[in-house]
A protein has these predicted regions:
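Bacterial Sec-dependent N-terminal signal peptides
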Residues: 1-23
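Sterically constrained small-residue positions within well-ordered secondary structures
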Residues: 12, 29-32, 168, 177
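N-terminal active-site segment of His-dependent metallophosphoesterases
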Residues: 18-98, 173
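Extended active-site neighborhood of metal-dependent phosphoesterases/phosphodiesterases
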Residues: 89-183
């Protein structure tokens, strides 16, 4: 009986290795070819605060990048809270296992996949400011998401306003969309 099980397992393994691997998810397409898409990313802080979750945010931005043309993605809107805490260097295993800098770097790295391909607009959240949650207004947002890094912002950003430090930043900016069929 053991010999039969080993033979069966060997045949299944051998046949599975001969099957072609799927390189990408099934191609996406719009129901109405005249329409376009805007993608909404919810608070990514849950992805960035644990190192084990960070690849999930990478997968989200990879999927977006892979579908820009087929879904006619005109913009990615992010509700903010890129990080759990803006300026915390103390790890708390129950709440997070990344420092704030590591969280900012993970968010920035995931979003880089979209640079020069599609504009992404981030509404900075309360967790993106202060030490824990906006108590002093300081943020690393412009250090990790500077205007210059994504050329697609030039076409739709109508203004960058000064932040609390007097620095023009995407954390306080205005965008304008001019697409047929919009609005």
């Amino acid at each position: 009986m053991k010999l039969f099980n080993y033979l069966l397992a060997g045949i299944l393994c051998a046949s599975a290795t001969c099957l072609p691997a799927q390189h990408r998810a099934d191609p996406q397409k719009l129901v109405n070819p005249e329409s376009f898409s805007m993608i909404l990313l919810g608070d990514p802080q849950g992805y960035t605060k644990y190192d084990i979750n960070q690849p999930l945010f990478d997968l989200c931005t990879a999927w977006i990048a892979d579908n820009i043309e087929s879904l006619k993605i005109k913009a990615v809107l992010c509700t903010g809270d890129l990080v759990e805490q803006n300026d915390n260097n103390v790890l708390n295993r129950k709440m997070l296992n990344q420092t704030s800098r590591e969280m900012w770097e993970a968010a920035s790295q995931a979003l880089k996949r979209l640079d020069n391909k599609v504009p992404y607009i981030i509404a900075a959240g309360n967790h993106d400011y202060g030490y824990k949650a906006a108590e002093n207004g300081r943020t690393y947002f412009p250090d990790y998401i500077p205007f210059e890094r994504n050329s697609t912002w030039r076409n739709i950003c109508v203004s960058e306003f000064p932040n609390r430090e007097g620095r023009a930043s995407l954390e306080n900016s205005a965008f304008e969309f001019d697409e047929p069929g919009w609005g």
